[in-house]
């Protein structure tokens, strides 16, 4: 059976992109994205839920994000899910976090 790992998100940046470079000179940008979902509860009241997602962009996409995006700006991200794991320096415990590795980014002209 074939596998598929694809994510498509439209949301607003929660902070300015943080750009850095690897020792080999590859650009990496870290973004925070807030994605809103509106639904009705059992009483018919409208409820807005926000999901906060960390996104990593690489190479030219990272540089473009740093150049054109800022906190509050709407953006479309296509990418894949990736599990990051590390050892907590304070407790020594293993930690993990699901994030999105962006493979395509489009600036949105409308504010979400």
Model segments located where?
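Core FKBP-type peptidyl-prolyl cis-trans isomerase
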Residues: 3, 9-49, 94-96
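Intrinsic-disorder/low-complexity, polar/charged segments enriched in Ser/Thr/Lys/Arg/Asp/Glu/Gln
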Residues: 6-8, 52, 72
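Residue-level recognition of specific faces of alpha-helices
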Residues: 3-6, 30-32, 54, 85, ...
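Conserved small/polar residues in nucleotide/adenosyl-binding loops
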Residues: 110-112
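Nucleotide phosphate-binding site architecture
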Residues: 20, 106-108
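Beta-rich strand-turn-strand
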Residues: 58-94
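A beta-strand/beta-hairpin structural motif
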Residues: 43-67
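OB-fold and OB-like beta-barrel modules that bind single-stranded nucleic acids
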Residues: 11-13, 33, 71-83, 102-105
């Amino acid at each position: 059976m074939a596998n598929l790992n694809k994510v498509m998100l439209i949301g607003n940046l929660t902070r300015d992109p943080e750009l850095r470079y690897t020792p080999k000179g590859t650009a990496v940008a870290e973004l925070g994205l807030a994605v809103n979902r509106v639904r009705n509860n059992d009483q018919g009241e409208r409820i807005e839920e926000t999901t906060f997602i960390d996104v990593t962009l690489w190479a030219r996409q990272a540089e473009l994000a740093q150049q054109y995006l800022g906190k509050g700006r709407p953006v479309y991200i296509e990418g894949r899910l990736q599990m990051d794991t590390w050892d907590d320096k304070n407790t020594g415990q293993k930690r993990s976090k699901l994030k999105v590795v962006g493979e395509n980014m489009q600036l949105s002209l409308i504010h979400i």
